Amino acid sequence: MKNQEESGWQAFLTLCSKMQKEKFLQDLFSLFLSFSERKDVASRYHIIRALLEGELTQREIAEKYGVSIAQITRGSNALKGLDPQFKEFLQKEI
Protein backbone atom coordinates (compact mmCIF):
# COMPACT_ATOMS: atom_id res chain seq x y z
CA MET A 1 0.00 0.00 0.00
CA LYS A 2 2.85 2.39 0.78
CA ASN A 3 4.21 2.16 -2.77
CA GLN A 4 0.74 2.90 -4.11
CA GLU A 5 0.49 5.97 -1.87
CA GLU A 6 3.96 7.15 -2.89
CA SER A 7 3.28 6.67 -6.60
CA GLY A 8 -0.06 8.46 -6.23
CA TRP A 9 1.61 11.36 -4.43
CA GLN A 10 4.34 11.56 -7.08
CA ALA A 11 1.72 11.50 -9.85
CA PHE A 12 -0.17 14.30 -8.10
CA LEU A 13 3.02 16.40 -7.82
CA THR A 14 3.75 15.82 -11.50
CA LEU A 15 0.23 16.93 -12.39
CA CYS A 16 0.64 20.07 -10.24
CA SER A 17 3.89 20.91 -12.00
CA LYS A 18 2.08 20.85 -15.35
CA MET A 19 -0.39 23.54 -14.34
CA GLN A 20 0.70 26.60 -16.29
CA LYS A 21 -2.21 28.80 -15.30
CA GLU A 22 -3.00 29.78 -11.73
CA LYS A 23 -6.72 29.21 -12.42
CA PHE A 24 -6.02 25.60 -13.41
CA LEU A 25 -3.98 25.07 -10.26
CA GLN A 26 -6.81 26.53 -8.14
CA ASP A 27 -9.30 24.26 -9.89
CA LEU A 28 -7.03 21.25 -9.37
CA PHE A 29 -6.69 21.91 -5.64
CA SER A 30 -10.44 22.50 -5.34
CA LEU A 31 -10.98 19.12 -6.98
CA PHE A 32 -8.57 17.21 -4.75
CA LEU A 33 -8.80 19.11 -1.46
CA SER A 34 -11.88 19.87 0.61
CA PHE A 35 -12.50 23.40 1.84
CA SER A 36 -11.22 22.35 5.27
CA GLU A 37 -8.04 20.87 3.79
CA ARG A 38 -7.39 24.04 1.76
CA LYS A 39 -7.92 26.08 4.94
CA ASP A 40 -5.36 23.87 6.74
CA VAL A 41 -2.83 24.37 3.93
CA ALA A 42 -3.38 28.14 4.08
CA SER A 43 -2.84 28.12 7.85
CA ARG A 44 0.36 26.08 7.43
CA TYR A 45 1.55 28.59 4.82
CA HIS A 46 1.03 31.50 7.23
CA ILE A 47 2.80 29.61 10.02
CA ILE A 48 5.81 28.70 7.87
CA ARG A 49 6.06 32.23 6.47
CA ALA A 50 5.92 33.79 9.94
CA LEU A 51 8.51 31.36 11.29
CA LEU A 52 10.85 32.06 8.38
CA GLU A 53 10.46 35.81 8.86
CA GLY A 54 11.31 35.38 12.55
CA GLU A 55 9.64 38.61 13.66
CA LEU A 56 6.82 37.16 15.78
CA THR A 57 6.81 34.87 18.79
CA GLN A 58 4.86 31.64 18.59
CA ARG A 59 2.16 33.16 20.78
CA GLU A 60 1.89 36.17 18.46
CA ILE A 61 1.67 33.88 15.42
CA ALA A 62 -1.10 31.90 17.15
CA GLU A 63 -3.07 35.06 17.90
CA LYS A 64 -2.54 36.66 14.49
CA TYR A 65 -3.57 33.62 12.44
CA GLY A 66 -5.92 31.84 14.84
CA VAL A 67 -3.81 28.68 15.03
CA SER A 68 -2.66 26.55 17.93
CA ILE A 69 0.80 26.47 19.46
CA ALA A 70 0.91 22.76 18.52
CA GLN A 71 0.41 23.65 14.84
CA ILE A 72 3.22 26.18 15.07
CA THR A 73 5.49 23.65 16.78
CA ARG A 74 4.83 21.14 13.97
CA GLY A 75 5.74 23.80 11.42
CA SER A 76 8.86 24.73 13.36
CA ASN A 77 9.93 21.09 13.58
CA ALA A 78 9.39 20.64 9.84
CA LEU A 79 11.61 23.65 9.12
CA LYS A 80 14.43 22.21 11.23
CA GLY A 81 14.81 19.25 8.88
CA LEU A 82 14.92 21.23 5.65
CA ASP A 83 17.81 21.23 3.23
CA PRO A 84 19.58 24.61 3.76
CA GLN A 85 19.30 25.51 0.06
CA PHE A 86 15.57 24.80 0.05
CA LYS A 87 15.11 26.85 3.22
CA GLU A 88 16.98 29.75 1.59
CA PHE A 89 14.72 29.42 -1.47
CA LEU A 90 11.63 29.57 0.75
CA GLN A 91 12.91 32.62 2.59
CA LYS A 92 13.26 34.44 -0.72
CA GLU A 93 9.97 33.28 -2.24
CA ILE A 94 7.60 33.45 0.71
UniProtKB/Swiss-Prot annotation:
Transferase as UniProt keyword: no
GO biological process, one term: regulation of DNA-templated transcription
Keywords from the UniProt entry: Cytoplasm, DNA-binding, Repressor, Transcription, Transcription regulation
Domain of life: Bacteria
Alphabetical list of InterPro entries matching this protein: Trp_repress, Trp_repress_bac, Trp_repressor/repl_initiator, TrpR-like_sf
DNA-binding segment(s): 58-81
Cellular component GO terms, alphabetical: cytoplasm
A GO term for molecular function: DNA-binding transcription factor activity
Record text on subunit structure and interactions: Homodimer.
Family assignment from sequence similarity: Belongs to the TrpR family.
Record's function text: This protein is an aporepressor. When complexed with L-tryptophan it binds the operator region of the trp operon and prevents the initiation of transcription.
Protein name as catalogued: Trp operon repressor homolog
Protein species of origin: Chlamydia trachomatis serovar D (strain ATCC VR-885 / DSM 19411 / UW-3/Cx)
Gene name of the encoded protein: trpR
